Amino acid sequence: MPSTREIRRRIRSVKNLAQITRAMEMVSASKMRRAQRNVLATRPYADRLLDVMGELTGRAVGMRRGTLLEVRPVVQGVALIVVTPDRGLAGSLVANVLRRASRFILDEQEKKHTVEVLAIGKKGRDFMVRTHQNLVAEVTKLGDHPRLTDILGISTHVINGFLGGRYDEVYVLYSQFVNTLVQRPTIKRLLPIDPPHEPAERMVDYTYEPSQEEVLRELLPRFVEVQLYQAVLEAIASEHSARMVAMRNATDNAKELQRDLTLSYNKTRQANITKEVSEIASGAAALAEM
């Protein structure tokens, strides 16, 4: 049985740990709220861009070939953009994303497709290097408030790769923010773009300058950039949410362990007192018999 001194030392250690995890929980909660606001702030622009894309592609029939809309009959090259945090302590979030990435890569390789990986985030980068995947580009240290320009290198790489024939399909894997308790690993196809087609009765007769084909060609890359940026923002919100929940669970576990250690301390202390009283009583009885 450990001594009371050892138990007291463990109680102090657990108490300090609970204070740290509680502070991390509060920081993550604040960051999560800001990340949620960032996600919501970009949605109106993304939704409006999607509407314009649907209206344009509904009119520009036969313009898919040679653009980011082209669906190729034979797929050979596939690019996977994996979005993960730079840091850990986020529960099972990172493991779930990387497990989904491994399964996707294996499935594509079984189809005889060449898979190239682009990593956004240190955790994903390290995993791809460790498992000897074909990592061709990486972006790390984005922070909690990334800008669209921070990921332009990745989006430009896949756009040029698609137009040049290096990639026939491009996917992004990220953790979708559902709510505070649920973050879902999600794979979305970025290229070729499959925008919604507006019904004829909903179309408005706009005038495009210089032409609707030129406008569409300019919008297609912007659409890919916004979709990737949206995925990164979702992943950041998911990261802080998962870390907040993980730190809350760690705090609760530390408090429960502290209660158990306190109970053990009291029992050990009571046993020591009982032993001392018994020894004193035995000594007094022995003296009385002399």
From Swiss-Prot:
One term of GO molecular function: proton-transporting ATP synthase activity, rotational mechanism
GO biological process: proton motive force-driven plasma membrane ATP synthesis
CDD domains noted in UniProt: F1-ATPase_gamma (cd12151)
Subcellular location: Cell membrane
Record function comment: Produces ATP from ADP in the presence of a proton gradient across the membrane. The gamma chain is believed to be important in regulating ATPase activity and the flow of protons through the CF(0) complex.
Database matches in PANTHER family: ATP SYNTHASE GAMMA CHAIN, ATP SYNTHASE SUBUNIT GAMMA, MITOCHONDRIAL
Family per record: Belongs to the ATPase gamma chain family.
Protein name in the entry: ATP synthase gamma chain
Taxonomic source organism: Roseiflexus sp. (strain RS-1)
